[in-house]
């Protein structure tokens, strides 16, 4: 959407993608030529994802030589999925079974803002500009895994989860001047400052026999 109201030029846009849930089933069966050997596997999955974007901006013409503008934008992308699998294996008439449940959730967000000032210096198109930008990005991911192994005389459970997050901030200021001397000849000077901050952290935990979550420092 674009609009002109007096000295204001306005623009905005919104978009989104919402996909149907992705569900599926996979089955595998292997036949052996010998008695007492078998392999059967089944998997189920269910995934949901979405994407959204919004942007709005404005430019104000102070006079014929000076103008200021600003724009902000937000983006979100997320997915959430579960899966289940079971495998039955018989080797030399000795049965073994494994069952797994998995959950994964991811979220990604971006916010950006821009402010600028422009001044036309002469009729040749010489211009003085000041532009300031800020971008914030944040992503998170969570996983939960439950696995069970079974044989004829024993069984074992494994449960673990993880959380990962990343934060990223960047701010820039750009000041420039372009002097058009004559056709196809110009002089450009300027300065730019950039500030960056990054924070990445993750946590991996396993569930012990008493029901407590124990951090795994080797992966964290």
Predicted regions mapped to residue ranges:
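Extracellular loop and loop/strand-boundary signature of outer-membrane beta-barrel proteins
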Residues: 39-44, 96-103, 157-163, 211-220
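Outer-membrane beta-barrel transmembrane domain signature of Gram-negative proteins
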Residues: 160-220
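Membrane-proximal, glycine/serine-rich, low-complexity loop/turn segments characteristic
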Residues: 1-84, 102-140, 171, 176-196
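Short linear motifs at secondary-structure transitions and domain/linker junctions
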Residues: 43-45, 91, 104-108, 151-153, ...
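Outer-membrane beta-barrel translocator domains and adjoining extracellular loop/strand segments
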Residues: 23-36, 81-96, 140-149, 154, ...
């Amino acid at each position: 959407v674009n609009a002109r109201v007096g000295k204001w030029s306005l623009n905005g846009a919104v978009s989104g993608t919402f996909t149907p849930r992705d569900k599926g089933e996979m089955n595998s069966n292997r036949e052996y030529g010998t008695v007492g050997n078998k392999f059967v596997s089944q998997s189920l999955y269910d995934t949901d994802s979405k994407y959204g974007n919004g942007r709005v901006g404005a430019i104000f013409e102070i006079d014929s030589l000076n103008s200021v503008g600003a724009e902000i934008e937000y983006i979100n992308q997320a997915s959430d999925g579960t899966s289940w699998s079971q495998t039955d294996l018989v080797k030399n008439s000795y049965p073994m079974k494994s069952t797994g449940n998995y959950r994964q959730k991811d979220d990604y967000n971006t916010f950006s803002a821009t402010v600028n000032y422009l001044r036309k210096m002469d009729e040749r198109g010489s211009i003085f500009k000041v532009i300031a930008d800020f971008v914030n990005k944040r992503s998170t991911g969570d996983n939960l895994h439950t696995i069970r192994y079974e044989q004829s005389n024993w069984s074992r459970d494994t449960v673990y989860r993880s959380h990962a997050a990343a934060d990223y901030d960047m701010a820039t200021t750009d000041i420039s001047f372009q002097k058009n001397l004559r056709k196809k000849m110009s002089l450009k000077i300027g300065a730019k400052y950039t500030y960056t901050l990054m924070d990445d952290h993750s946590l991996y935990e396993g569930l012990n026999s008493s029901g407590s979550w124990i951090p795994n420092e080797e992966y964290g």
